[in-house]
């Protein structure tokens, strides 16, 4: 608030809202229940919002930062622009907040480093009832298809990006198969309570 006042001379009151999953936020906006100045969704939601004309162009003054322009901008802009729609570049509407944050958090007291190097550990019955998954269908789908295509990924015959954007009936059936096999191992689908479960050794 103080920074905004310093930059613009205007007083504002910040209202900060969080949502368990992207889709709840998107539904509120689509139904006209909420308007936001800034939202922080995952990339697939940015793509949906752009398709539905739910975004406004952003002020790009920040882009005059030499460090951003020389080190970060070229790669990030390329990735964001993959979400572009006809006549609309996504980088006019979005900037990157985090990148490549999906991974495995584990307790070394129960799970060796060598085991956690592969998504295979999630399907290991040894850890049944001690695994939490993010309550995100995108993350769950990605985990399943990456695991299912581990051999092809290693051989370089397919990329993660191609797998994540393949929603063909065959891809969906394969993801369903592996997620059903994973289900008995899952203790819960979490948005934020996972950290507490980890600290109490209720999840590994």
Regions found by a protein language model. Give the residues of each.
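Early extracytoplasmic/lumenal segment of secretory-pathway proteins
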Residues: 1-52
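Hydrophobic/proline-rich hinge and linker segments of small-molecule sensing/allosteric domains
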Residues: 101-113
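Structural recognition of the beta-strand scaffold that forms the well-ordered cores
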Residues: 14-17, 37-40, 96, 103-105, ...
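Extracytoplasmic
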Residues: 9, 34, 41-43, 90-92, ...
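Flexible hinge/capping segments at coil-to-helix
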Residues: 112-126
